[in-house]
Amino acid sequence: MKSFKIGDLTVKLPIIQGGMGVGISLSGLASAVANEGGVGVISCAGIGLLYPRFSKDYLTNSMMGLREELRKARAKTRGIVGVNVMVALSNFSDMVRTAISEKADIIFSGAGLPLDLPSYLREDSTTKLVPIVSSARAAR
């Protein structure tokens, strides 16, 4: 199989693991896929439900949970790890900011048109942005 590039990242195998929530696409699966040469993906959907120990606030738990999952994945792989953040999430902005601050390699974003996604990146950000486009109309 041929490798492919996303920006300056080279993906050895043309496999991108889907972001499956709630609690399926976490650090274990993402790091395993990344270790095999694909792109491992952590899903943000419902991640705050898995981390109630941080706070009584779901939004805080979501950000802290994503932070922890990214750090756990990084400890298990040197491969490419991304995050799936649905635009439809009420905490979309917070999750995007968290993924960028934790230096996720890629943010995949669908379930809506993420037109403002590039505005979250700073000049020194290395995170790649990959919109999930569901139709030809949306691509236009």
Language-model segments: residues:
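Active-site entrance/lid segments in N-terminal catalytic domains of soluble metabolic enzymes
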Residues: 1-140
